[in-house]
Amino acid sequence: APEVCAILSRESGALLGAVGLQPSSEIFPELSATEQREMGYWLGRPYWGHGVMTEAATELLRFGFEMLGLEAVWCSHYDWNSRSRRVIEKCGFRYQFTKETTNVIGMTNKTVFYALKKEEWLAFSGEKEFA
């Protein structure tokens, strides 16, 4: 089942966005869908550029690797979405490949895919190995 979290304002409790982990085996065929997840997110435009999504994504990765026992997480962004690219880079993901994709309304985009394995996350984040 997907794990989805609301991102709320610390001050007002207002909804700012959401971040989630969806079971998927698209990137690492050697891992089951329970060992890897796709990370997705959205953030309301007024909250862009304040580090909100990077903080939320970092905490979701910690949850995924520590609590769910994931071996890998992957994510993607359209090639024109530089803000999403920066979130992904700040979280330690590594580039995998780019391919053309078509969304649900029929728009074609170049989609850039990234992945992060547990051992890479541990090294990048400075977290200690967990039991």
Per-range role (PLM):
Residues 4-131:
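Acyl-donor (CoA/ACP) binding surface of acyl/acetyltransferases
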